[in-house]
Regions:
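Switch II (G3) loop of P-loop NTPases
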Residues: 123-129
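Active-site-proximal flexible loops/turns
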Residues: 21, 87, 132-133, 161
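Generic hydrophobic secondary-structure packing signal
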Residues: 77-80, 97, 133, 137, ...
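Short, glycine-/Ser/Thr-/acidic-enriched flexible segments
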Residues: 63, 75, 92, 129, ...
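Acidic, Mg2+-coordinating active-site environments of NTP-dependent enzymes
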Residues: 1-123, 146-147
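Active-site beta-alpha connecting loops in nucleotide-dependent enzymes
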Residues: 108, 132, 138-185
């Protein structure tokens, strides 16, 4: 798949993912790497999570580019921002424009969507339907708020639930309380 990239293109890859790192030597196209790992070309340093915001210092080959302020929480969103930064820099977009654009981004519907606060309880709706997404979302909550986390989960599809039930179980260990509803068929 990566080798199908046109000769004028590049593959943007997160080196924090072991499977991605393993296939890098097999990619014949130019590769741009990002992640928290020290061997990534684009890195995030001095990461801070405060409620719905994430802040980090963006670096390119260890050289500081500047601070990025995101209006979405979590390490996974910082990695998404690093991917966008690396691609934007590759396309010669000015870093200040990248900063402004990322600061304006506030997420998409049903992904960490704050529904309201009721009796000092923050209600968040998130359509995480894979264990990796569930873990990332719950970790973002734990890192940003440092409060008790009650999770209500509605599994989608019997086949997915059966296939990933052990991974789902591990992902929910982050929660203080877990409520599981009926499977949505």
């Amino acid at each position: 798949y990566a080798n199908a990239t046109p000769f004028y293109g590049a593959v943007v890859a997160c080196v924090d993912e072991p499977m991605v790192k393993r296939i890098l030597p097999d990619i014949s196209r130019p590769v741009i790497t990002y992640g928290f790992s020290g061997d990534a070309e684009f890195q995030a340093d001095c990461r801070e999570y405060r409620e719905i915001r994430s802040t980090f210092l963006a670096k390119n080959r260890k050289k500081e580019l500047g601070e990025i302020n995101l209006n979405v929480p979590g390490a996974h969103n910082i990695k998404n921002a690093l991917a966008a930064i690396s691609l934007s820099i590759e396309m010669n977009i000015d870093f200040e424009i990248i900063q402004k654009g990322l600061k304006k981004y506030s997420g998409v519907k049903r992904r960490f969507e704050i529904k309201g606060i009721y009796d000092d309880v923050l209600i968040i709706d998130d359509y995480a339907h894979h264990p990796t997404e569930v873990s990332a979302t719950l970790r973002a909550i734990k890192n940003g708020w440092r409060r008790r986390l009650v999770t209500i989960f509605q599994p989608h599809l019997f086949s997915r639930t059966k296939h990933f039930y052990e991974d789902f179980a591990r992902s929910f260990l982050i929660s203080d309380v877990l409520i599981i509803t009926d499977v949505f068929p």
